Amino acid sequence: MAVPFNERGGRLRGGIDLLAGRLPSFVFGGAVGRMLPVFHFHDEAPADLEPKLRYLSDNRYRTVTADEIAGYVRDGRAIPERAVALCFDDAWASLWTDGGPLLKRYGF
């Protein structure tokens, strides 16, 4: 099962979700189980994206490919520990020029 996580609704959305208890358990160090956390970025500035990628990298999360996700869904393969999916909406040129180097820097 995919767990969408994004910040639609403004910059305070993550804090509001945190206070309301709507964040997936892995955010607090809990087990993901059979869920795959999906981070959806929409029109994300590099200054906002970098700390999120740094957090994931520093805490040993790894990204999965579309083929791996298909294997989890189609074949029932186990989702590895600390696996996350990163999804980027609106393929602006800056995703390639700014986001690409950040993803590479943090091992994604």
Over which residues does each language-model region extend?
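Terminal accessory/targeting
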Residues: 1-86, 93-108
